[in-house]
Amino acid sequence: MAFVDQAQIEVKAGKGGDGIVSFRHEKFVAMGGPFGGDGGHGGSIIFKVDEGLRTLMDFRYNRHFKAQPGGNGGTKGMTGASADNRVVKVPQGTTVSDADTGEVLADMLENGQELVVAKGGRGGRGNIHFATPANPAPELSENGEPGQIRNLKLELKVLADVGLVGFPSAGKSTLLSVVSNAKPKVAAYHFTTLSPNIGMVRLDDDRDFVMADLPGLIEGASQGIGLGFQFLRHVERTKVILHLVDMSGIEGTDPYTQYRKILDELQQYDETILNRPQIVVPTKMDMPDSEENLAKFRKEVATDSGLPIQPEIVPISSITRDGVKDLMRLTADMLATAPAPESYRPETKNDTSEKSYTFKPETHDFTVEWIADEERWLLSGAEIEKLFLMTNIQRDATIMRFARQLRHMGVDDKLREAGAKDGDDVRINNSDFVFEFSE
């Protein structure tokens, strides 16, 4: 199965049910008054973490998620049925962002964690809510509020305890297949691994951890070259890094040069990655020149003052299994004390860190535009369009209420400033109205 780690989808919450206009008609109840009920709430779209999922494959074939609308209100003040929320399961480790603004909405880390990504519209109010001493029998009601619509970007970063990094053909897939139940593709050519493979490693002392074989890295990856960012985003979440370096030299490559290039790419992408526990793993020690190359490599590491830390070096041969058990034990020891990556620690309920909030005063953003070829004004804006959709245009009373709401928002003044005259056509959301300015 391919590892799909990015997807873009659309979510559409359910519209609220419409409120209705109704009056109480009962024997012996004089002037019963308004009795129209409210609409039910529309269903929301909720993401929920399911630790059993491993990829975003499902979102490749289903990119549109829609919740049901709420039921309309009834007579006798009865409220319409609220729609069920639609729960969409996502893998553990999914980052959810708004595709239009780039805002990160949440990092879905904990099994069972939920996030409302599109809120269902509230039900419209029935005429029972609009009675006043001046108007005891109102013919006013609201349509349901539109459900929220969002374009979302999903990005899955591997949640593994240990990440295997290194140049292509360094032996990452072979090591994973030896120490775990994973069956990655292994072949004698570069970039055999194009997507992460994950395996569970279990030691003789019952310690276990999750290991990920990440796609091979090349120079320039921090600028997106090769598999670039697709590789590096997964490294961010690993607690311990095993840096595999090919000691065979069969392709004329210098092990230490390759090692430094990988470090440079990690540092350019995110320098904090280099502060994590790391083991350098010289591989293919069963090859003829490997011992000589290892001795030279150790000397170069020891004399390099530019290294962030002097790493542990554990040579292995995945073919003969030499050194593999020692490597896994040392890895488990490091994991026991390794902290979670700082940027991905889930916030705890007892978090007492100071938070700041910004007050945003209410604004009425809308635009007025003259469409010359149609000889009409175009009035647009999210708030205006929402108010219009919640207006029952079949009833004069609700249209008059909508006109008052627009006047309160400053629409009349804005139209007059733009040059609108009495009798001009004004279009709102594909419906036309006649402009009449009121002082």
Curated annotation (Swiss-Prot):
Residues 358-439 form the OCT domain. Its EC number is 3.6.5.-. Residues 344-354 have a biased composition (Basic and acidic residues). Its main location: cytoplasm. Mg(2+) binds at S173, T193. Its cofactor is Mg(2+). Keywords: Cytoplasm, GTP-binding, Hydrolase, Magnesium, Metal-binding, Nucleotide-binding. Pfam families: DUF1967, GTP1_OBG, MMR_HSR1. Residues 1-159 form the Obg domain. One of its GO terms (cellular component) is cytoplasm. Monomer. An essential GTPase which binds GTP, GDP and possibly (p)ppGpp with moderate affinity, with high nucleotide exchange rates and a fairly low GTP hydrolysis rate. Plays a role in control of the cell cycle, stress response, ribosome biogenesis and in those bacteria that undergo differentiation, in morphogenesis control. Belongs to the TRAFAC class OBG-HflX-like GTPase superfamily. OBG GTPase family. This is GTPase Obg. It comes from Leuconostoc mesenteroides subsp. mesenteroides (strain ATCC 8293 / DSM 20343 / BCRC 11652 / CCM 1803 / JCM 6124 / NCDO 523 / NBRC 100496 / NCIMB 8023 / NCTC 12954 / NRRL B-1118 / 37Y).
